[in-house]
């Protein structure tokens, strides 16, 4: 794939860096601090898109000052059941409560992403349905003590040791649950290159 500009992944997530590296495309990372505030009037899908846009706007401002051109990739992932959003937990108690709520049920993982060049602004979201097995309080506590997934939406990482034992089914893109829907990002990159 011949890129017209370098790719900048605007993310602090090590998982997103690992996933984008699977494409074998060269990229650099940039950290941007944005509020990532949820809008209660928006759906989870609309919220992830809004936050991805907000991050892309922040990077665009930085690039405008340096007169750099790039393909900017931003993303945001949320775990939800219907309109109820499960963010990143503040600690053990909140994480325990989230997993108690999610266990034995199906929930949705939404990732919104934005790809932006000087002339193109592409955004979309991807949804994956995940069902967790019933988990005892002991199993939840053991997982939390072992993995401490406090930096993850919904209080779990699908790729974590132990969590694999509790995933009953996945309907949709696995990589979306990890944090970046690679196949959709790849297709969007191809479309952007075709338009240059």
UniProtKB/Swiss-Prot annotation:
Record keywords: Cytoplasm, Hydrolase, Nucleotide metabolism
Single annotated GO MF: UTP diphosphatase activity
Catalytic activity, EC: 3.6.1.9
Family designation: Belongs to the Maf family. YhdE subfamily.
Source organism phylogeny: Bacteria, Pseudomonadati, Chlorobiota, Chlorobiia, Chlorobiales
Pfam family, one: Maf
Organism, as annotated: Chlorobium chlorochromatii (strain CaD3)
Function: Nucleoside triphosphate pyrophosphatase that hydrolyzes dTTP and UTP. May have a dual role in cell division arrest and in preventing the incorporation of modified nucleotides into cellular nucleic acids.
Site positions (Important for substrate specificity): 15, 77, 159
Active site location: 76 (proton acceptor)
A GO biological-process term: nucleotide metabolic process
Superkingdom of the source species: Bacteria
Subcellular locations according to the entry: Cytoplasm
GO cellular component terms given for this protein: cytoplasm
Co-factor requirement: a divalent metal cation
Claim: Hydrolase is one of the keywords in the record: yes
Principal location: cytoplasm
Catalytic activity: dTTP + H2O = dTMP + diphosphate + H(+); UTP + H2O = UMP + diphosphate + H(+)
Official protein name in the record: dTTP/UTP pyrophosphatase
């Amino acid at each position: 794939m011949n890129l017209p500009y370098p790719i900048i992944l605007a993310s602090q997530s090590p998982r997103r860096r690992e996933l984008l590296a699977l494409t074998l495309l060269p990229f650099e990372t940039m950290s941007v601090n944005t509020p990532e505030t949820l809008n209660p009037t928006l759906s989870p899908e609309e919220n992830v898109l809004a936050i991805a846009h907000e991050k892309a706007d922040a990077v665009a401002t930085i690039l405008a000052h340096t007169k750099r051109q790039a393909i900017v990739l931003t993303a945001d992932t949320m775990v939800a059941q219907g309109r109820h959003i499960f963010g990143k937990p503040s600690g053990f108690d909140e994480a325990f409560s989230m997993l108690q709520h999610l266990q034995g049920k199906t929930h949705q993982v939404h990732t919104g992403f934005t790809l932006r060049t000087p002339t193109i602004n592409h955004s979309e979201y991807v949804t994956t349905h995940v069902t967790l097995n019933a988990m005892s309080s002991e199993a939840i506590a053991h997982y939390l003590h072992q993995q401490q997934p406090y930096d993850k939406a919904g209080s779990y990482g699908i790729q974590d040791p132990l969590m694999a034992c509790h995933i009953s089914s996945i309907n949709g893109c696995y990589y979306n649950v990890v944090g970046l829907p690679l196949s959709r990002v790849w297709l969007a990159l191809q479309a952007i290159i075709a338009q240059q």
